[in-house]
Amino acid sequence: IKKPYKKRMTAEAQRRVVLEYLRAVMQKRISFRSAEERKEGAERMVREAAQLRLLFRKLAAGFGEDADGHCDTIAAIAEVIKLTDPSLLYLEVSTLVSKYPDIRDEHIGALLAMRGDTSRDLKQTIIETLEQGPTQANPNYVPIFKEIMVPSLNVAKLLK
């Protein structure tokens, strides 16, 4: 395969793999029961992101480009899951929203529901507060969350 095509194919393959990974995480009805389970789940996500990063670095060798971009998204989601202090959730989620401006309320709701330790009031407060703040997109940002559909049933249940 010629270099420009290989470069484009590798970048698209990485985007799709990460997209499907995030889709699986967001759509599964996983709910961690304890801080230990959250920690183990988040560490597994970080390990898998590192494996994907290594694979795509090998595939992208010689292109002179950063091949980590999309894999970092998995690690960022893992950080929200791993967080042990629920009072810091708002800060971590707001960092996620500023990094990934296409992330929607449904994604945040699914992520907080997955944690299993967030009250409905806290979820609603976080989502409402984040809706009020403007998000300034990085001009180089390639949207990934806009392609991830989250079952609306979860969000409706969360906010009631």
Please provide the spans of the model-predicted regions.
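Extended alpha-helical "rod" scaffolds
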Residues: I1-K160
